[in-house]
């Protein structure tokens, strides 16, 4: 299956994707996948629509699964329009996947926090999720959401790429500490590294 996918709902803040939910799900079935996840860019508002499509698909493909998720922008605690530092602040990509109804509720709560504190910066609405949000909501009741490291826009892939170039051991220790923190937040067996097949040399 494929666990990191976007639909037209990723266009809420930027032009990103033209795929419709129905087309994505039907194509996953056509390819013989057992599961497909929908992880739009800080957007969970298509959940009801996806559930309706999934119910119809499930009649003919009872073993097929659709996972509801969200690709958040993970930032340091307290980041806002007034204290953003171009030198070191980033809106790191990070994927959340709901394992059950409780997990989807947790993802919605995290998304709500991000949108409530959102702000305009450099021509785009920024929707930061703080590490503290993950601690408050997921760490408080772990086991319902899977976290993955996302693409090269994620904190871990970026740091791994820099480590590969520099072999700096301090950076390596920070990478390990970050992964340990994520496993602590999500719970054992609920934090994963994302791997994407791609021709991009940096992703190999």
Q: What are the residue ranges of the model-derived segments?
A:
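Phosphodiester-processing cores and adjacent nucleic acid-binding clamps
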Residues: 1-204
